[in-house]
Structures are given as structure tokens and as C-alpha cells.
């Protein structure tokens, strides 16, 4: 897959390759392509097309990162400067556009309308989720349902598509395809919920970013929503002021409120429920080392610190 990524990043425009390689070289978990490849293994598909589509998924994800960092005005990702900080906003946005268009070129090469439909829908839903999150910024009254709706669009949808693509490549039955998609959606939901916990309780040295970055950017995530529900009137006022202004000068107080209300434990419990839903969805697959790896992946998400 890495060879495919390297080859398809090529462009006659030097800056495109420079920025693309900069963000790809930053590392990352490669979770979405790994999910696709593991699911292909679980379904017995060994064709070369799996590497092409794994690269497509990674390109789409990388494009969203480039655009997200511009929208969020982020300066640090994975412990080093974001592409927009290093190269400027215009270049980052345009290279993100290039990665989207290159991904669509590659999915056309697959020659399967179902694959193109799956990826086109996923890309559209991700964009809708990002816009909805933008509309929800600094909203202290955001509900848990509204929060879940956003993360299922902007994060879980690409996990879902990755798992579904494996089923399409393997020519699986509609029942198996649906189970794969269910696994991906639940896994992606758990991943984002844990990510939101880490903004208040993560290992800064491993994350490569600071605690409270989401709050500073105006993102209202599940730990804050639960803390708002459970806090005293004074605590709610403190949280509301921070949410509406993005002021993290009282971050120590905010962290104490989140801890005292049990918001982190409740959020982790939500992630655990989603991880179990993912594991349960795998019951339709034969018991192989690949299925075991997919089950382990769901369990490991709950214990990550970055």
C-alpha cells in the first residue's frame, strides 16, 4: 500500500508532492486502510485492488486533515508543524483538493460502480459532517444526539466505507456487507469518542498536541456535554463561558469539573458500548486470525493514549 501511495502522489507540480509527502511522512495510525486490508483478509479476498483502495481511503483521510487544520487554525499535529503552518493555508487547501481528485481517479480505476458510489457517498457525508461541526462551534447547549450525528458523519463514515469496500471486493452477500459496514461505523464512532476523551486526559508527549485544543477551537465534545448535564450551576457557568469564548485560561478548573462529574468515565463507557457493537458485528465472519485481529483492534482503541 505504501508503494501505491508513493507512486500516486506524483505530480508535475513540485509543491503538491512536497506537501503531500510532508503530511504522509508525519506518520499516523493508518487505521482506515488497515481496517480495509484486515477485512479483506477476513473475507478471503487477496486481489491487488485492495492495496489501491486502501491508498484511496488514506488519500481521502489525508485530504480531510489538510482541510481540518486550516479550518481549526491548527499549528501542531503529531508533534510537528501542520502543513498549513509550514506552507500556508492556500497551498494546504489546494493540495487537499488534489488528494481528493487523485483519490477519485484511483477509485474509477477499480471499474466498479458500487465502489465509486460508496466512496462518493462517504466523501459527501464527511463534508456535511464537517460543515455541521462548524455550525455547532461554541454551542454550549449541544445535545448528545447532535454530537453523535456529527462524529458518525465526519469520522465514522470513512471507517464504515473502508469495511464496506472489503465486502464489495470480496463479492460478499448483502448480509455480510451490512455487517462489515456496521463494524466500521461502530469502530469509527468509538475511535472518535476516545479521541475526544484524550483532549482532556491524554498523554501530551504522545499526542503531539495540547490538552484542551478542542475546547480552544470551540468544539463541544461528549465529555463537556456530560459535564454540563451533571455539573452544579456554578460549574455549568464556568463551562459555558469557556465553550462560548474558547477561553482556556481556567483549564485546570475545567479539567477538575470534567473529572468530578464523572464525564470521562461516562464517555469511556459510551466508547466501550460502540466497541462491543463492532465486535458483535463480526460474528457473521468465519473465525480466522483476521477476524481475531479486527476484534483486537476494537479492544485496543479503548486503551490508546494518543
Predicted stretch roles:
Residues 1-306:
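All-alpha prenyltransferase/terpene-synthase fold signal
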Amino acid at each position: 500500500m505504501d508503494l501505491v501511495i508513493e507512486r500516486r502522489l506524483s505530480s508535475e507540480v513540485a509543491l503538491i508532492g512536497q506537501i503531500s509527502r510532508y503530511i504522509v511522512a508525519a506518520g499516523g495510525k493508518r487505521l482506515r486502510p488497515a481496517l480495509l486490508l484486515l477485512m479483506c483478509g477476513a473475507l478471503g479476498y487477496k486481489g491487488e485492488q485492495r492495496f489501491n483502495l486502501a491508498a484511496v481511503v488514506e488519500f481521502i483521510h489525508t485530504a480531510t486533515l489538510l482541510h481540518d487544520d486550516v479550518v481549526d487554525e491548527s499549528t501542531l499535529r503529531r508533534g510537528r508543524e501542520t502543513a498549513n503552518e509550514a506552507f500556508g493555508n492556500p497551498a494546504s487547501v489546494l493540495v487537499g483538493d488534489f488528494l481528493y481528485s487523485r483519490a477519485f481517479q484511483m477509485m474509477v480505476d477499480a471499474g466498479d460502480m458500487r465502489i465509486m458510489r460508496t466512496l462518493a457517498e462517504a466523501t459527501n457525508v464527511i463534508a456535511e459532517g464537517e460543515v455541521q461541526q462548524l455550525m455547532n462551534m461554541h454551542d454550549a447547549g449541544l445535545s448528545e444526539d447532535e454530537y453523535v450525528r456529527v462524529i458518525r458523519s465526519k469520522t465514522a463514515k470513512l471507517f464504515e466505507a473502508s469495511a464496506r469496500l472489503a465486502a464489495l471486493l470480496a463479492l460478499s452477500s448483502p448480509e455480510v456487507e451490512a455487517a462489515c459496514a456496521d463494524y466500521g461505523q461502530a469502530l469509527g464512532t468509538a475511535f472518535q469518542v476516545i479521541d475526544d476523551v484524550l483532549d482532556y486526559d491524554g498523554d501530551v508527549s504522545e499526542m503531539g498536541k495540547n490538552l484542551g485544543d478542542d475546547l480552544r477551537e470551540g468544539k463541544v465534545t461528549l465529555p463537556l456535554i456530560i459535564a454540563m448535564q451533571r455539573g452544579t450551576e456554578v460549574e455549568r457557568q464556568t463551562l459555558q463561558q469557556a465553550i462560548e469564548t474558547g477561553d482556556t485560561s481556567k483549564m485546570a478548573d475545567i479539567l477538575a469539573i470534567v473529572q468530578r462529574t464523572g464525564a470521562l468515565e461516562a464517555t469511556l463507557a459510551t466508547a466501550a458500548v460502540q466497541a462491543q457493537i463492532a465486535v458483535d458485528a463480526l460474528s457473521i465472519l468465519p473465525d480466522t486470525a483476521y477476524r481475531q485481529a479486527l476484534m483486537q483492534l476494537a479492544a485496543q482503541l479503548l486503551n490508546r493514549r494518543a
